[in-house]
């Protein structure tokens, strides 16, 4: 999942560099990537046990950073509305 998210973000940035429309792709990145990262970080926390929650490892800081990204530029629910409007049109969403 993480590699898929990475490639999707790189493709979105490429579209932006080419001055092509990329609003829906950007919404997918903003809505999908933080959720995937939270899942990956939670797996890391489970793997490391209670030591993963301490400040000795950077995992807890990364979890806080990603949780901030979940609400930055709109929550995942807002991003899903943007994607649906792009796919189905404003009159349906």
Feature annotation, model-predicted:
Residues 1-93:
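Alpha-helical interface subdomain recognition
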């Amino acid at each position: 999942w993480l590699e898929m998210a990475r490639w999707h973000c790189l493709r979105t940035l490429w579209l932006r560099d080419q001055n092509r429309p990329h609003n829906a792709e950007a919404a997918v990145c903003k809505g999908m990537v933080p959720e995937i990262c939270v899942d990956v970080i939670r797996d890391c926390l489970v793997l490391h046990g209670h030591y993963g929650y301490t400040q000795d490892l950077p995992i807890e800081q990364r979890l806080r950073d990603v949780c901030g990204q979940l609400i930055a530029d709109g929550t995942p629910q807002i991003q899903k509305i943007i994607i649906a409007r792009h796919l189905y049109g404003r009159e349906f969403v």
